[in-house]
Regions:
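Short, Lys/Arg-enriched, disordered terminal segments
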Residues: 1-4, 8, 134-158
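Long, charged low-complexity interaction segments
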Residues: 30-81, 148-158
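Short, cationic/aromatic linear interface patches
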Residues: 85-146
């Protein structure tokens, strides 16, 4: 029996009993895998895996993988971007905006433009949620007629 090391807790486990979401990635169980996905290494892995599948099969080489990883680490270490934020920005670019992925530009076609735009959207959404918590619900019932608005409870429009 061969032994492998859990990526999260670093315990040695039997390869046959290990949880493996994909080739050469082993964990004690699904709980270790979930915890690992929340770490920087796990989030970087998710980003690299997602971006890797955006490239055309002819461009999926080891040098392309290294280039993607270096770009991601640069944006993380130098620019201060978070891996989870980068992952969401790439998904936003591809799935929501439906932009075509250009193999020649790599992550540079998404960062920093869309990362910063998403960051602002998130901050606005967070501020709106906070504002909603502080506002109270109005008890006035409003019925919309064909030509005008009728407020019940005897309220005037003045």
């Amino acid at each position: 029996m061969s032994k492998v090391k859990c990526r999260y807790c670093k315990e040695k486990i039997d390869k046959e009993n290990a949880f493996s979401p994909r080739e050469k990635l082993y964990f004690c169980d699904q709980e270790c895998y979930r915890k690992w996905r929340k770490t920087d290494d796990g989030q970087l892995d998710a980003l690299l895996d997602y971006v890797w599948h955006l490239y055309s099969p002819s461009k999926q080489t080891s040098s392309t993988y290294v280039m993607i990883k270096k770009q991601a680490e640069h944006y993380h270490n130098v620019e201060g971007f978070k891996y989870q934020g980068m992952f969401l920005a790439v998904r936003y670019y591809v799935e929501i905006l439906e932009r075509l992925w250009c193999d020649d530009y790599g992550l540079g076609q998404v960062f920093p433009t869309y990362y910063i735009a998403l960051q602002h959207m998130y901050e606005e959404q967070k501020a709106l949620k906070e504002k909603l918590k502080t506002t109270t619900k109005s008890k006035d019932k409003v019925a919309i007629g064909s030509h005008n608005i009728i407020r019940r409870k005897g309220l005037s429009l003045e």
